[in-house]
């Protein structure tokens, strides 16, 4: 089965608390092979990304309503689309699930005026680097990004400008 058979569902259509609990319960599956330890993975799933900021998050569901992947993200006040986390179940990796989730996020973000999308990865995270390159994101080393000695790589992709809103014709 391909990623095209999946249904992307925005968090706003789901029970935020139940979804967060479900994804956290399966985090060892979704994050298998990640360079992040379990505490770091759990910390990515702050409740605010499900409750208050869930409008940009999405889960990819199989025809059997199983979770295949998900994305947590937000657009900041200065119009930067920030990917907090993207994870794909190992059974679905390599099928375009992350690409579909990220493209959905980018389209939503551009629609509200975001100029760029950004994610942060650990140096040497080959999976994140490959996905970023596939999507046209540029990597930039960020020494001390997460504190002294906690270097990261910032992955940035420019987003297309949303078409300007045309004012209504006052004669109509």
Question: Language model features by range: what are they?
Answer:
Residues 88, 94-107, 130-134:
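Conserved acetyl-CoA-binding loop-helix of GNAT-fold acetyltransferases
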Residues 55, 150-156:
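Short hydrophobic/aromatic beta-strand or adjacent loop that forms the aromatic wall/cage
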Residues 10-84, 89, 102-104, 145:
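Acetyl-CoA-dependent GNAT
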Residues 86-93, 121-123:
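A short, internal acetyl-CoA/4′-phosphopantetheine-binding micro-motif in the GNAT/acyltransferase core
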Residues 109-121:
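Conserved GNAT acetyl-CoA-binding A-motif
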Residues 73, 158-160:
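Residue-level recognition of strand-loop junctions within catalytic nucleotide-signaling folds
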Residues 99, 123-141, 147-150:
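Conserved active-site alpha-helix within GNAT-family acetyltransferase domains
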Residues 1-21, 160-172:
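Conserved N-terminal entry element of GNAT/NAT acetyltransferase domains
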């Amino acid at each position: 089965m391909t990623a095209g058979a999946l249904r992307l569902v925005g968090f706003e259509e789901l029970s935020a608390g139940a979804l967060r609990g479900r994804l956290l319960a399966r985090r060892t599956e979704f994050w298998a092979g990640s360079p992040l330890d379990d505490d770091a993975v759990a910390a990515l799933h702050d409740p605010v990304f499900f409750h208050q900021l869930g409008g940009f998050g999405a889960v990819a569901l199989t025809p059997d309503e199983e979770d295949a992947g998900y994305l947590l993200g937000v657009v900041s006040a200065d119009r930067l689309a920030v990917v907090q986390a993207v994870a794909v179940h190992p059974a679905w990796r390599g099928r375009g699930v992350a690409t579909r989730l990220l493209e959905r996020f980018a389209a939503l973000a551009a629609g509200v005026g975001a100029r760029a999308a950004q994610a942060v990865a650990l140096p040497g995270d080959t999976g994140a680097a490959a996905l970023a390159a596939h999507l046209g994101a540029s990597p930039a080393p960020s020494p001390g990004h997460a504190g002294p000695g906690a270097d990261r790589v910032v992955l940035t992709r420019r987003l297309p400008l949303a078409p300007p809103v045309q004012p209504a014709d006052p004669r109509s």
